[in-house]
């Protein structure tokens, strides 16, 4: 009995423009997976589309069809074994031919395919595998033109994209280029076997007291002959040590066992405990020979989405292992427009950055792709909760029978693939499709519960989100929460702040509110909000080649910002708050200050509301990352270089964070008058599960002199409420008694150490003289590649930002420094002889 074997078909490929019939048209492909844009670059037929205006010169690639070909030899095949040609992903309209005969046609990028080629490979020797990738943009347009009755309402990109099951951002988005890829975007291989384990999954029951857990494991077997003589040997282990073992026979090609685990190690999100991962393994055996084995990492945990009526409306927050978790985190877009270029190492670095930023949840956005296994593995291992959108975004999708069939296959395949990951806590039907329904005035009668009726309306996609997808999740992953859309709340208008989740874009988009009042604009769970900022100069210098183009309004910089009206919006928020500048380096920094302040005001206020009966259950900023070097809402750029906002968010999400703020006075209104008094508030937010005692101080320091304008307030033995908010005090600033501008500087000590700081500044910054701060940055110790810097100032300093240098990490940045409160920053990665990191602060 031959064991399972597989042969990757990753090398030996060539490709060409499908229309070019000349023999010299064929070009070598370095490695598969790949897409045509990558392979054209490798053959010097295409300039890097991420530099300058090269994206425009690459547009021709989008309109072409491409053919890939390889020659391989038939592998050794034992009697009774089959040969399967397995494709994990074809982008998108693919016709696969083996020795000239069509063996597969695919039109869904998000599906895997398995083709039995045993008979086709009966002959020994060489065999030719050829794949034609038809132009997706052309096919999309043709499909749209065939259905003139459908309302193709959408945001972003060509509405025809909705006819095709392909990453929607490939049609261009307001943060990315228009690069429509084609190719073998995931692994292709030959598998040879008489029997194999085709699926392994578990169902976990955790007792309410967490003292026991029941792990039911299931293995599905693909075999050509009877499975009566096979057995499945299951092993459950933790950190390499056996927990339980059991052998099972197969019934209807499925084997299952149940393990009772005592004192289970639970999987927790980062900051709440260890993300313990068990390994479930199964070995398929016949006549004491191992035929095939599979193993997966799983977690023992419960995950609930709590939606209950309360005085604010209806709650929306996550409860993990019985603990309410404020989900501070980010939205995720694909990390590259050329998806096969993203390595497992790069995925892990992104998730490591999230953990370093104290972020708990990542939302996989519905206009990209179901991510690579290594993405979810990193989330599992590092304790990051995943909000997983299905791949529908910003549109009214058609529901032709053949499209619904493809979508159902897509959902089945991906939920099967992903369901063992403990990090995934919610599946969500779409991104902003209900907002498209609202804006286009499409029919949505929430009280009509007949799915067949939905298909007859001008919003037929409701059938996908409220019937098809939840049915798949219920069948394949019944313990995972399903939510119809983002944003969505019980069929109400998507801007309703009392129910469901909310995309709050009235800062930046919409009414362009002041970011200082961001916290008043939120809902029960703020799953999108953002503010643009330029990336660091090192990133700009990558895509801006000419020195003459290095000024804020240059054509190439505009070209690399795809957001509608970006210049007006950036300018508005800059001139309202800061003294503007025309040199690029300062301008870049100023946009970053605005982004950092915006994120701070939002997160800080919404986390405070967590303590008000879970008024706000979480905040996922738009967006964590970029898909190319650009100017966008990302808080970390394409090259994994954090912007100042990354650090501002990390501080607000500390296990214990202190907050201080005075009421916002809007100087931009007609006939604005200086306020006679201003109220202020001081509070502590904690995600710890037990009460903590601390000492809190509030100082009132002159911006101009650095001296106290009134006596500090000190409170000892403050009891800090666990997993909530502790309101410390409210006060009033008398502007007649203290007329000079001053900051409110709060510090919190726990166990004798400063654990949190916050500084509230007079607004707007443009009215303040922030020159001559008396800032000093001194190296106080050095050990190996680690340095400690002590930062002090004679006058309050706003937003001290350290240079982001590749391979170097700073423990904090975008810091406010006040007199009498020196702060220490750890720099890791500097070698002997390296220049010290540069830094910049507001008013420098």
Swiss-Prot record:
The name this protein goes by in its record: Beta-mannosidase B
Keyword Hydrolase: yes
Function: Exoglycosidase that cleaves the single beta-linked mannose residue from the non-reducing end of beta-mannosidic oligosaccharides of various complexity and length. Prefers mannobiose over mannotriose and has no activity against polymeric mannan. Is also severely restricted by galactosyl substitutions at the +1 subsite.
Catalytic activity: Hydrolysis of terminal, non-reducing beta-D-mannose residues in beta-D-mannosides
InterPro entries: Beta-gal/glucu_dom_sf, Beta-mannosidase-like_N2, Beta-mannosidase_GH2, Galactose-bd-like_sf, Glyco_hydro_2_Ig-like, Glycoside_hydrolase_SF, Ig-like_fold, Mannosidase_ig
BP-aspect Gene Ontology terms: glycoprotein catabolic process; polysaccharide catabolic process
Family: Belongs to the glycosyl hydrolase 2 family. Beta-mannosidase B subfamily.
Principal EC category: hydrolase
UniProt KW keywords: Carbohydrate metabolism, Glycosidase, Hydrolase, Polysaccharide degradation
Entry annotated with the keyword Cell division: no
Organism: Aspergillus oryzae (strain ATCC 42149 / RIB 40) (Yellow koji mold)
């Amino acid at each position: 009995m031959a064991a399972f074997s597989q042969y990757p078909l990753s090398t030996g490929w060539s490709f060409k423009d499908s229309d070019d019939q000349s023999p010299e048209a064929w070009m070598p492909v370095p490695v598969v997976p790949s897409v045509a844009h990558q392979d054209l670059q490798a053959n010097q037929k295409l300039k890097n589309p991420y530099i300058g205006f090269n994206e425009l010169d690459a547009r021709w690639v989008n309109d072409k069809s491409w053919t890939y070909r390889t020659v391989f030899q038939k592998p050794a095949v034992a009697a009774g074994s089959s040969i399967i040609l397995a494709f994990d992903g074809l982008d998108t309209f693919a016709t696969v031919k083996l020795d000239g005969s069509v063996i597969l046609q695919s039109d869904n990028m998000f599906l895997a395919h398995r083709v039995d080629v045993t008979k086709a490979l009966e002959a020994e020797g060489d065999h030719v595998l050829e794949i034609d990738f038809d132009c997706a943009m052309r096919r999309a347009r043709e499909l749209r033109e065939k259905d003139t009755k459908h309302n193709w309402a959408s945001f972003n990109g060509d509405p025809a994209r909705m006819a095709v099951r392909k990453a929607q951002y490939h049609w261009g988005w307001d943060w990315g280029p228009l690069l429509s890829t084609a190719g073998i975007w995931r692994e292709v291989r030959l598998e040879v076997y008489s029997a194999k384990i085709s699926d392994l999954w578990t169902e976990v029951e955790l007792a309410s007291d967490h003292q026991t857990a029941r792990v039911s494991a299931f293995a599905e077997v693909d075999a050509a002959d009877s499975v009566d003589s096979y057995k499945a040997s299951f092993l459950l282990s933790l950190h390499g040590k056996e927990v339980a073992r059991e052998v099972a026979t197969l019934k209807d090609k499925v084997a299952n066992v149940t393990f009772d685990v005592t004192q289970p190690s639970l999987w927790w999100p980062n900051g709440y405990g260890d993300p313990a991962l068990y390994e479930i393994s199964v070995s398929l055996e016949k006549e004491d020979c191992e035929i095939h084995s599979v193993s997966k990492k799983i977690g023992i945990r419960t995950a609930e989405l709590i939606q209950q009526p309360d005085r604010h409306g209806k709650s929306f927050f996550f409860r993990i292992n019985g603990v309410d978790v404020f989900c501070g985190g980010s939205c995720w877009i694909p990390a590259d427009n050329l998806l096969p270029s993203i390595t497992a190492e790069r995925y892990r670095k992104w998730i490591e950055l999230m953990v370093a930023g104290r972020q708990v949840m990542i939302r996989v956005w519905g206009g990209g792709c179901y991510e690579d296994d290594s993405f979810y593995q990193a989330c599992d291992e590092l304790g990051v909760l995943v909000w997983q959108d299905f791949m529908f975004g910003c549109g009214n999708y058609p529901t032709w029978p053949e499209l619904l069939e493809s979508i159902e296959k897509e959902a089945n395949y991906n939920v099967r693939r992903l369901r063992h990951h403990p990090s995934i806590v919610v599946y969500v039907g779409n991104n902003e499709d209900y907002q498209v329904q609202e804006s286009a005035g499409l029919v949505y009668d929430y009280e009509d519960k007949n799915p067949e009726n939905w298909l007859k309306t001008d919003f037929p996609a409701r059938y996908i989100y409220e019937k098809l997808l939840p049915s798949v999740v219920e069948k394949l992953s019944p313990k995972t929460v399903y939510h119809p859309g983002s944003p969505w709340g019980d069929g109400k208008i998507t801007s309703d702040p009392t129910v469901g989740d909310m995309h709050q874009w009235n800062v930046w988009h919409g009414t362009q509110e002041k970011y200082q009042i961001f916290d008043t604009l939120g809902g029960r769970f703020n799953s999108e909000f953002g503010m643009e900022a330029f990336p660091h100069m090192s990133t700009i210098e990558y895509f801006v080649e000419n020195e003459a183009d290095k000024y804020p309004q240059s054509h190439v910089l505009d070209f690399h910002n795809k957001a509608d009206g970006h210049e007006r919006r950036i300018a508005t928020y800059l001139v309202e708050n800061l003294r503007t500048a025309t040199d690029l380096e300062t301008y870049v920094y100023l946009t970053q200050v605005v982004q950092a302040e915006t994120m701070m005001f939002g997160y800080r206020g919404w986390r405070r509301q967590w303590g008000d009966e879970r008024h706000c259950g979480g905040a996922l900023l738009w967006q964590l990352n970029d898909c190319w070097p650009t100017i966008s809402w990302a808080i970390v750029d394409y090259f994994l270089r954090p912007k100042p906002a990354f650090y501002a968010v990390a501080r607000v999400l500390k296990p214990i964070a202190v907050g201080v703020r005075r009421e916002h006075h809007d100087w931009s209104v007609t006939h604005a008058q200086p306020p006679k008094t201003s109220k202020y508030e001081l509070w502590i937010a904690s995600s710890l599960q037990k009460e903590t005692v601390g000492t809190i101080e509030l100082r009132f320091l002159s911006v101009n002199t650095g001296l106290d304008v009134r006596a500090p307030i000190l409170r000892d033995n403050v009891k800090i409420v666990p997993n909530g908010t502790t309101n410390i005090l409210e006060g009033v600033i008398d502007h007649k008694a203290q007329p000079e501008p001053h900051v409110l500087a709060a510090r919190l000590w726990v166990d004798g150490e400063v654990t949190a700081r916050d500084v509230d500044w007079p607004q707007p910054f443009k009215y303040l003289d922030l020159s001559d701060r008396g800032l000093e940055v001194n190296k106080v110790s050095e050990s190996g590649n680690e340095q400690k810097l002590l930062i002090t100032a004679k006058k309050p300093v706003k937003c001290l930002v350290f240079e982001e240098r590749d391979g170097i990490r700073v423990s904090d940045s975008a810091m406010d420094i006040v007199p009498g409160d020196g702060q220490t920053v750890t720099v890791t990665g500097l070698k002997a002889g390296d220049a010290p990191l540069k830094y910049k602060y507001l008013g420098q």
